Amino acid sequence: MTQEELFKKLVAHCKEYGFVFPSSEIYDGLGAVYDYGQNGVELKNNIKRYWWDSMVKLHENIVGIDAAIFMHPKTWEASGHVAAFNDPLIDNKDSKKRYRADVLVEEWLAKQDEKIEKEVEKARKRFGADFDEAKYRETSPRVAETAARRDEVHKRFADALNANDLAELRQIIIDCEIACPISGTRNWTEVRQFNLMFSTQMGSTSEGASTIYLRPETAQGIFVNFLNVQKTGRMKIPFGIAQIGKAFRNEIVARQFIFRMREFEQMEMQFFVRPGTEMGWWNEWKNIRMAWHRALGFGDDNYRFHDHDKLAHYANAATDIEYNFPFGFKEVEGIHSRTDFDLGSHQKFSGKKIQYFDPETGESYVPYVVETSIGVDRMFLQVMSAAYTEEQLEGGDSRVVLKFPPALAPIKVAVLPLVKKDGMPEVAQKIVDRLKYDYNVVYDEKDSVGKRYRRQDAIGTPFCVTVDGQTLEDGTVTVRHRDTMQQERVKIEELHAMVDEECSYRKLFKMLNL
């Protein structure tokens, strides 16, 4: 099965089992807008809780806020979004399709890396145990030629982005012979910049209304509340402010399911530090955030850092944590050193003093900021991609199972009476009542037990508890484990402790060493 076929199966699975639906589907949907179903919203909330608790609950110097989506329009002038929040877009004249020019080049660069790795793998198979990978990379003419070409284009690309040279960006696309995936032609328009902010009107009449924006990021709500939080919370630098909230971007090229959407949710933390210490903290947060991802157990090799070729107008350092999706390595989280740009700019535009008096140094200054920003929807897709598993079983049977970390699973326990009589449903319902105050539990009596197991596998439920005839005799139930399908007899009164041990966030938090 190709990665593209796997991704299509994953998207279909999300809809079939109540994770993600196309929005407004009865009206044929709305491009790049999706709704989360009954299982999707539970998974999403669990991801958010894992982030919030690890960020706020486990750090004494980080607190949370919930800022409004609508903000004074001057906020976005000060932040630079009105003038500089753009994407470089290019159209193919034959297919009439529009693409991000920078993404086309990034994908070409990634293909060169893939070519090199294929050459290395072929050589590894050819030479066997005697293969010296480092020497081969240095001496192979084909690898050297591809690497040199890649490095040359990468430098031109980085220079073009930093100089905002749209003509050079188009020329790179031409020189690399990048073709439209739809038409197969290289008949490109000029590259143009498009602002990504949604605007609307606030006011009772159109004549008296003022233009405001749907926020394109949640960070600015934190910055404008810096002094409110610092003073009321008596916070001392270094400290952080965290927020989870919706943001909106008029993405011209929205694709890959929920990976890139026009309405999305962010989990951001802005960490305020003394000027001159920001790079140390930036490196510290890089390590903390990578550990957070790897604690989920999806394989360390599926994550990597990717430093930015072009820094945003507010940053002096930036890197992404990328995950190996079915469509390749893509960003799930960014860690940025934002300097004092945001607070300094808001101080300038508002005319209000936004500074911190440091009792340790006896001086006042505008703090520097280190940001961690993760997309909830991308994280959701990462978890789904990693968890989705197709297994061939003995006897020619097969199953689809979502191997979520138990703490993130939408449903923790399914309670199943073996038959719908003989008092088994009543006992099963009592078990549900015992567990439901602490865990998301479902009761299911429809179809055979085997079919019910498969249904729970498909939504990622870690435990299936079956009430049978023996339960009525000795108070034990059959517990089936999702990943291994192994079964064991457990006393009803021991169920809570068993579920707690496997499904608690503590198992994840202990791996973070916070």
Predicted regions and their residues:
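NTP/phosphate- and nucleic-acid-binding module
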Residues: 1-514
